[in-house]
């Protein structure tokens, strides 16, 4: 099921650039919290699907100085914004960003230790296919994390945490667990699973 939300779903042009700046500020707590649960370590390889303006990638690169991070997003506008934000890490060879889709990730099997997506599953054309791709590119014993707003209204209600946990289990992830941030003013859930 795809939820089309206009500019937030695929930011483009000047308006998309502005939307990206707003998303960067608004999603900062989501990024920080998800990365704290995922705990990307030095020397690990991580992938973010739907990186938007690139804030989570930057935070991860800053927190683990020898990690390698890749990102895929389907918005050329967000790719440009994320490249600008992560320019130093790209020049160091620690970050690699590309235009693409969760439906066909441009990476080899078992390429990453950790994979994550924050507030993006709402825009996936086929969540089961996307989760299968995440499982394909994460190594055995690796972890996948999907963070969503823990809200019971559209469009967020389509991917409630229990639904996400079921979808991850059906995609072949094990030890699937739901974490909630416990912040009533900004409720989030992160579903973690192991390959």
Please provide the spans of the model-predicted regions.
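Conserved alpha-helix/loop element of class I SAM-dependent methyltransferases that forms part
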Residues: 25-44
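Class I SAM-dependent methyltransferase SAM/SAH-binding core
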Residues: 45-104
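Helix-to-beta-strand junctions that scaffold the AdoMet/dcAdoMet cofactor pocket
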Residues: 64, 124-125, 138-139
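A short acidic, Gly/Pro-enriched loop at the edge of an enzyme's catalytic core
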Residues: 103-114
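A short SAM/SAH-binding and catalytic strip from SAM-dependent methyltransferases
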Residues: 114-126
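A short glycine-rich, Lys/Arg-flanked "PGG" loop and its adjoining helix->strand segment in the class I
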Residues: 128-140
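Conserved beta-strand signature within the Rossmann-like core of class I S-adenosyl-L-methionine
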Residues: 141-149
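Core SAM-dependent methyltransferase catalytic element
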Residues: 183-195
